[in-house]
């Protein structure tokens, strides 16, 4: 595997840095934006992956500047992976991953390993968030890379009704944020994903939350409301995991 620059951890040791990195994964040359904090020796760092939405590869991530502020403030490694243009999955993040469509899962798997080799990464704090289609891909990580992903926070996405091979070696705590009036990714209704046959029908948001609540065998439910959102929390789940859902009332 080729990683460029090779020793970026040492190169950017004493300053906040941004760089665009190329990473060869199988036959594909993948890219990602990397932000690292000012480092001190033996400092253990968490990773936060943020996955862009459909068509978002060439544009800043939503509120990207706010995320960048967290790099030094919270001492995190911030990564914006970039999707790869493939015709058979409409050129975006692969959903309903199967044994012959693991290119995006393999990308993140390899990327975690490379970052861990270059930095003192805290393997118990590897997080993923995403917007829209990127949000949907975080559920792929929860299903197919749960041995390395600590938790996910999904914003304005969903997942397929019939999810392939979602085997939990360890449960991944989930936060899902969604606007009740979302006109693109429906909150209340199932919908069909264009002509992408491998994906098919997509879940409405209440069904999405129920899927994970049932999968984790959560026994307790708590609700709290404000004028802006409703928060539903499922706790007392297997392996001390939990599922949280913020329903945004006016969005």
Regions found by a protein language model. Give the residues of each.
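Primarily recognizes the serine-hydrolase "nucleophile elbow" in alpha/beta-hydrolase
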Residues: 63, 116-172, 183
